[in-house]
Amino acid sequence: MQLNMLKCKLHQACVTDTELDYEGSCAIDANLMDAAGIREFEQIHVYNLANGARFTTYAIRGEAGSRMISMNGAAAHLCSEGDRIIICCYANVDESELDRHEPALVYCDGDNRITHQRNGIPLQVA
């Protein structure tokens, strides 16, 4: 059986720009994409921490080192500059491979600098 599992995420990334009339949906600094393992034109899920919007779009490569996260086209209606977001990708993983599956988790500060990376989420306790 195939299960749809978290492949990677950019956690607490900050929207740097919105371009309603730009072709392409979400431009992400190429260094951030590489760190997380996001491929150009890969489907991404965006969760906006500022307004609760959740939507699906695709990633395009932004200039390396720019720290840009630009929401383009229709996605520009769902985010504002300065909004903190989570960008996730999912992948189908065979049930027999689940014990070896480790998502790439990349954590960002307010300037989209990578603060740390890990391959799992700590246990949430009551």
Curated annotation (Swiss-Prot):
The keyword Cytoplasm applies. Its main location: cytoplasm. It catalyses: L-aspartate + H(+) = beta-alanine + CO2. Pathway: Cofactor biosynthesis; (R)-pantothenate biosynthesis; beta-alanine from L-aspartate: step 1/1. It is found in: Cytoplasm. GO terms for cellular component: cytosol. Heterooctamer of four alpha and four beta subunits. Catalyzes the pyruvoyl-dependent decarboxylation of aspartate to produce beta-alanine. It comes from the Bacteria. Belongs to the PanD family. The keyword Lyase applies. Keywords: Autocatalytic cleavage, Cytoplasm, Decarboxylase, Lyase, Pantothenate biosynthesis, Pyruvate, Schiff base, Zymogen. Substrate binds at residues 57, 73-75. Its cofactor is pyruvate. Is synthesized initially as an inactive proenzyme, which is activated by self-cleavage at a specific serine bond to produce a beta-subunit with a hydroxyl group at its C-terminus and an alpha-subunit with a pyruvoyl group at its N-terminus. Its EC number is 4.1.1.11. This is Aspartate 1-decarboxylase. The active site is at residues 25, 58. Binds 1 pyruvoyl group covalently per subunit. CDD domains: Asp_decarbox. One of its GO terms (biological process) is alanine biosynthetic process. The modification Pyruvic acid (Ser) is found at residue 25. Transmembrane segments: none annotated. It holds the Pfam family Asp_decarbox. The gene is panD. GO terms for molecular function: aspartate 1-decarboxylase activity.
